[in-house]
């Protein structure tokens, strides 16, 4: 887990995007200083590499609350309107890998809530799902991502998906 302390890095801004039926997204912009050879001074360690887990926390030191948990997906250099060089990290929630690749699968004699828990469990996520009641003899996932299939099954049962870290 990465800890970016404002005394260590000059954090320009941090944005967190959360919505129902969407995977959380966050961006953090850190000041990147220009050195003599017109190269950018990017932190030399690997804490900003894609795949690194990151946690956004805020509040007084005795009452810190977590606003976002996820992993770095991309990093880039940008120049803003004030000609300030920024090192921008884009992060996604832990459910993000469920959007990779379309899959085919058949679930037999299963309830939708059990299927949702099983799929999300493959990505190290825990799910709190209301009971869906009806056992379906054969449920087919055809050429869609696991995330899209989870959303479809939740919507068919009048449920919404809200991600929060590894839940």
Locate the predicted segments by residue.
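Short beta-strand-centered interaction patches in the first periplasmic/extracellular domains
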Residues: 79, 86-95, 131-167
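Polar, S/T/G-rich
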Residues: 59, 63, 107-122, 142-156
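Juxtamembrane "anchor/assembly" segments of surface/extracellular structural proteins
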Residues: 1-53, 87-98, 130, 159, ...
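Aromatic/His-enriched, Gly/Pro-containing loop or helix-boundary segments
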Residues: 42-43, 100-111, 132-146
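N-terminal export/assembly leaders
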Residues: 25, 99, 116-141, 167
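Short, acidic/charged, Gly/Pro-enriched secondary-structure junctions
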Residues: 1-3, 38-78, 113-122
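Signal peptide-directed extracytoplasmic domains
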Residues: 69-76, 81-95, 102, 110
């Amino acid at each position: 887990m990465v800890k970016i302390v404002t005394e260590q890095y000059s954090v320009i801004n941090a944005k967190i995007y959360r919505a129902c039926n969407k995977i959380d997204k966050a961006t953090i912009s850190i000041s990147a200083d220009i050195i003599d050879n017109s190269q950018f001074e990017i932190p030399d360690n690997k804490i900003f590499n894609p795949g690194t887990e990151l946690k956004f926390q805020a509040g007084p030191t005795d009452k810190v609350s977590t606003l976002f948990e996820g992993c770095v997906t991309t990093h880039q250099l940008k120049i803003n309107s004030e000609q300030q060089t920024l090192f921008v990290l884009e992060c996604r929630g832990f459910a993000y890998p469920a959007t990779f690749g379309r899959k085919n699968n058949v679930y037999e004699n299963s309830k939708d809530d059990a299927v949702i828990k099983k799929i999300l469990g493959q990505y190290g996520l825990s799910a709190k799902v209301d009971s869906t009641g009806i056992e379906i003899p054969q449920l087919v996932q055809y050429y869609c991502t696991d995330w899209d299939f989870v959303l479809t099954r939740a919507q068919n049962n009048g449920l919404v998906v809200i991600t929060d870290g590894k839940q």
